[in-house]
Amino acid sequence: MSTELAARGAARVEWIRSRMPLLAATREEFAHSRPLEGQRVGMSLHLEPKTAVLLETLAAGGAEIVATGNHGSTQDDIVAFLRAGGMTVFGARDDDWDQHHVNVQSVIDARPSILLDNGADLVAGVVAQGLADSVIGGTEETTSGGLRLRDELAGAVPFPVIVINDSPLKAIGENRHAVGQSVVESFMRITNLMVPGRRFVVAGYGWCGRGVAQYLRALGGKVAVVEMEQVHRQRAGL
């Protein structure tokens, strides 16, 4: 079964890999320069095809990969594919929250030197367990993780962390358009309902909320927005 899963994952990764030319170019460069030789990358991100291509790129640069996913989003065929490629991966689709925390701890126990985080779980763990001195840097994917770094962990993290969600490119490309479109498509597929003429309430008008509202309106939905921040509320009204 794991062989079948790995083959299914390989086909999905191959399809998305062919549509990610920037990472393909980076992977080719990394294969020659090996900038991550001797580094162990600990990751806690969604385990799906695009993430697999990212991990392949890091591995091509010499990194050892130790990874887990996020609760509820892990795709078993991608886990099987990554394991077949020699990476250490913890997690399964049906993991509950307790198992997810065990998986995160397993990544921390591997003593990674670079962290790719979502929600600041890895960063908080290495700081709380006195392991931060072995980490040279990391990234944080989300707004919630960025807020946690700036609030709960403010002044406690001795290594640099780049908050990917602060990038205007991510805000426009992923948050507004990718999230906006995929949320609306998921609504239609899960409910088997169409958007035109229906009333929707979008809670929050940040980049993701703007995208969801934009795609709902484009499909004929009637959209109301709930937003606490005055400028965002005014923007929604316009």
Regions found by a protein language model. Give the residues of each.
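Glycine/serine-rich phosphate-binding loop and adjoining beta1-alpha1 elements at the start
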Residues: M1-L36, G69-T74, V79-R198
